[in-house]
Amino acid sequence: MLGLENKLKLYGFNNLTKTLSFNIYDVCYAKSEREQKDYIAYIDEQYNSERLTRILCDVTESIGAHVLNISKQDYDPQGASVTILVSEQTLAVKEIDASCNKGEIDILKTRDTVVGHLDKSHVTVHTYPEYHPDNSIATFRVDIDVATCGEVSPLNALNYLIGSFDSDIITIDYRVRGFTRDVDGKKLFIDHKITSIQDYIDENTLKRYDAMDINVYQSNIFHTKMLIKEIELQNYLFNRDVYEIKPKQRLEIENNLRREMIEIFSGTNIY
């Protein structure tokens, strides 16, 4: 069976574009508007552009690519974005465009904003904290895209990405576009076997989630959604202890959290 480790022999450069879109949702119970704002401020600090940059640099390394340029920004009142331009092979300094900062740390420390450019191979992340004063639940979404061309596969970064965030709901999309050719000139529209994104996720991780697939094999489109199975209430309380809450209210909070997760997972207003 051909997988990521079994490479086809190709003619010329591998022109396939592989794109992984990865969204995680973290849900929290914050009763008052003050608690909600404090949660958003906490999340905003925890996942600022500096930390996200480190995560994306690790992603770049895990897929076997090399950083050419980093662009990052923290937003007011909240949120952050990071974009990294990557290359499949190591490039000599003289081959790198003068506008690229190569991810040098000194540059990141001396500028609030680093502006660069994109290419076909890039890694991006955006964060979206959210709450409503009429609802006791706040959410935090991280949107990551890993797009590569050539032999580099973004699927290699999946387990690292899942482990980098507190994820109650995960949605993953993977698609392959373009074509390359084998040595005999035959077109190849995908260069590895894949039946499900779940095949690339650690078994211990999958045990913690209910997962479902929606795949369009003839179009090389793969989609997986994951919903956390067990709710440990203490992990969802912000600045509160579960023992301060009466048992009846605990059950109500758990039900509200589960309803919120189910609606996000299904993409539908159910309740």
From Swiss-Prot:
<dbReference type="Pfam" id="PF02675">
    <property type="entry name" value="AdoMet_dc"/>
</dbReference>
<keyword id="KW-0620">Polyamine biosynthesis</keyword>
<dbReference type="InterPro" id="IPR009165">
    <property type="entry name" value="S-AdoMet_deCO2ase_bac"/>
</dbReference>
<comment type="function">
    <text>Catalyzes the decarboxylation of S-adenosylmethionine to S-adenosylmethioninamine (dcAdoMet), the propylamine donor required for the synthesis of the polyamines spermine and spermidine from the diamine putrescine.</text>
</comment>
<feature type="active site" description="Proton acceptor; for processing activity">
    <location>
        <position position="126"/>
    </location>
</feature>
<feature type="active site" description="Schiff-base intermediate with substrate; via pyruvic acid">
    <location>
        <position position="121"/>
    </location>
</feature>
<feature type="active site" description="Proton donor; for catalytic activity">
    <location>
        <position position="149"/>
    </location>
</feature>
<dbReference type="GO" id="GO:0004014">
    <property type="term" value="F:adenosylmethionine decarboxylase activity"/>
</dbReference>
<feature type="site" description="Cleavage (non-hydrolytic); by autolysis">
    <location>
        <begin position="120"/>
        <end position="121"/>
    </location>
</feature>
<feature type="modified residue" description="Pyruvic acid (Ser); by autocatalysis">
    <location>
        <position position="121"/>
    </location>
</feature>
<keyword id="KW-0865">Zymogen</keyword>
<comment type="pathway">
    <text>Amine and polyamine biosynthesis; S-adenosylmethioninamine biosynthesis; S-adenosylmethioninamine from S-adenosyl-L-methionine: step 1/1.</text>
</comment>
<keyword id="KW-0949">S-adenosyl-L-methionine</keyword>
<keyword id="KW-0068">Autocatalytic cleavage</keyword>
<dbReference type="InterPro" id="IPR016067">
    <property type="entry name" value="S-AdoMet_deCO2ase_core"/>
</dbReference>
<keyword id="KW-0704">Schiff base</keyword>
<dbReference type="GO" id="GO:0005829">
    <property type="term" value="C:cytosol"/>
</dbReference>
<keyword id="KW-0456">Lyase</keyword>
<keyword id="KW-0745">Spermidine biosynthesis</keyword>
<keyword id="KW-0670">Pyruvate</keyword>
<dbReference type="InterPro" id="IPR003826">
    <property type="entry name" value="AdoMetDC_fam_prok"/>
</dbReference>
<comment type="similarity">
    <text>Belongs to the prokaryotic AdoMetDC family. Type 2 subfamily.</text>
</comment>
<dbReference type="GO" id="GO:0008295">
    <property type="term" value="P:spermidine biosynthetic process"/>
</dbReference>
<protein>
    <recommendedName>
        <fullName>S-adenosylmethionine decarboxylase proenzyme</fullName>
        <ecNumber>4.1.1.50</ecNumber>
    </recommendedName>
</protein>
<comment type="subunit">
    <text>Heterooctamer of four alpha and four beta chains arranged as a tetramer of alpha/beta heterodimers.</text>
</comment>
<keyword id="KW-0210">Decarboxylase</keyword>
